[in-house]
């Protein structure tokens, strides 16, 4: 049986890891052992942050809706409650976009919410 030298395989594997650390600072982009740890950690951060991204965007939408609602004399929770009672089916992402870019339409929604709360 012939002797298998693993130089080619190891070199290819190292090259793959070092390619993923391109742009990293110092040894993290040059030394395989450090680069491998950096790639593992980057993967952990990416996994965690894909989940955090959803929470952060929801928090941003709520902050924007709250700001728009307060300009129209409502709090965020009263605005959402009023819209639910008025049977306005609109998600927070779209509502936040309306609050940012179309104040007139948002004011109309706020009035609808106020009407539903009063009734």
Curated annotation (Swiss-Prot):
Coiled coil start-end: none
GO molecular function per UniProt: rRNA binding; structural constituent of ribosome
GO biological process, one term: translation
Gene Ontology CC terms: ribonucleoprotein complex; ribosome
Cross-referenced PROSITE patterns: RIBOSOMAL_L20 (PS00937)
InterPro entries: Ribosomal_bL20, RIBOSOMAL_L20_CS, Ribosomal_protein_bL20_C
Keywords: Ribonucleoprotein, Ribosomal protein, RNA-binding, rRNA-binding
Keyword Repressor in annotation: no
Gene3D superfamilies found in the cross-reference section: 6.10.160.10, Ribosomal protein L20
Function of the molecule: Binds directly to 23S ribosomal RNA and is necessary for the in vitro assembly process of the 50S ribosomal subunit. It is not involved in the protein synthesizing functions of that subunit.
Family note: Belongs to the bacterial ribosomal protein bL20 family.
HAMAP family: Ribosomal_bL20
The protein's name: Large ribosomal subunit protein bL20
Record organism: Acinetobacter baumannii (strain SDF)
Taxonomic lineage: Bacteria, Pseudomonadati, Pseudomonadota, Gammaproteobacteria, Moraxellales
